[in-house]
From Swiss-Prot:
It is found in: Endoplasmic reticulum membrane; Protein storage vacuole membrane; Cell membrane. The keyword Flavoprotein does not apply. It is a single-pass type II membrane protein. PROSITE patterns: C2 (PS50004). Residues 1-245 are cytoplasmic. InterPro entries: C2_dom, C2_domain_sf, C2_SRC2/BAP. It comes from Glycine max (Soybean). This is Protein SRC2.
Length: 290
């Protein structure tokens, strides 16, 4: 079923007592007329600029639209007229007039003549200031105008907009996967040579200074023994290396003295046993008769 369209002829006549948005000069005013509610056939027009019009501009500017009659009867179409001050540093909206198209359709007037009406101009503050005068007339039915396709171009751009998020997601995956291996490599080296614990205590100096046999012998046992306990138990003691060296030297001296005493005692006891055995043998020999 085809939609029925009718022509709507307008004559934007004039405005009266509208707000003056200029401070030092008279306003140069024009009107922007648009028909809203029909997304397939957006329509609009702009009058000429009335120079030095002030608050009472006059245009007598003709405008012609094609109106979807079914949408107008459903009260889905409206006529919007904006009064604008033309300024060098940027135009300023003085006020706006909204007219439901059904209201005009229900009061067509004579078919052969225009009907003149007046509507209040609403400022941006929702207060009325001044009035707008225009006339209108509905014509005969006409074929539907060609549908404009601005949205088709936007639809074609939607896939382009979808690519950046996908690329961002794919690029984030490679950066996330390579990060776990480095901690595993450092952990593997940590099991072979505990660098953090070695720097806390001083066992690595013995391991690096002496041959591998001594390094894997006593120095490692002392490194995994006392240095770990001092590192985890009393971290502040690592800042006092001189006291630790003195304690180790004193312990080594005591241990060396004890070992020396034990060795000397063993030598004395061995000499005593040897002397006793010699005497016993001599006594036995003395029992022989020559």
């Amino acid at each position: 079923m085809t939609m029925e369209y009718r022509t709507l002829e307008l004559n934007i006549i004039s405005a009266k007592d509208i707000k003056n948005v200029n401070l030092f000069s008279k306003m140069d005013v024009y009107a922007a007329v648009s028909l809203s509610g029909d997304p397939l056939h957006p329509q609009g027009a702009t009058t000429h600029v009335h120079k030095d019009a002030g608050s009472n501009p006059t245009w007598n500017y003709p405008v012609k639209f094609s109106v979807n009659e079914s949408l107008a009867k459903e009260n889905r179409l409206s006529l919007e007229i904006k009064l604008i001050s033309d300024r060098t540093l940027g135009d300023t909206v003085i006020g706006t007039v909204h007219v439901p198209l059904r209201e005009l359709l229900d009061n067509p007037g004579d078919d052969s003549s225009f009907r003149q009406v007046s509507y209040q101009v609403m400022k941006q503050s929702r207060k009325s200031k001044g009035s707008l005068n225009f006339s209108y007339k509905f014509g005969e039915h006409v074929p539907a105008p060609a549908a404009k396709t601005p949205k088709a171009a936007k639809a074609g751009q939607e896939p382009v907009m979808a690519y950046p998020p996908a690329g961002a997601g794919s690029s984030s995956m490679p950066y996330g996967t390579p990060h776990p291996p480095p901690p595993q490599q450092y952990a593997a080296t940590g099991y072979g040579y505990p660098p953090q614990q070695v720097h806390g205590g001083y066992p690595p100096q013995a391991a690096y200074g002496y041959p591998p046999q001594t390094g894997y012998g006593y120095p490692q046992q002392s490194g995994y023994g006392y240095p770990q306990q001092s590192g985890y138990g009393y971290p502040p003691q690592a800042q006092k290396p001189k006291k630790n060296k003195f304690g180790m030297g004193l312990g080594a001296g005591l241990l060396g003295g004890a070992l020396g005493g034990m060795l000397i005692g063993d030598m004395v006891s061995d000499a005593a046993e040897y002397d006793a055995g010699y005497d016993a043998g001599f006594d036995d020999a003395g029992g022989f008769d020559f």
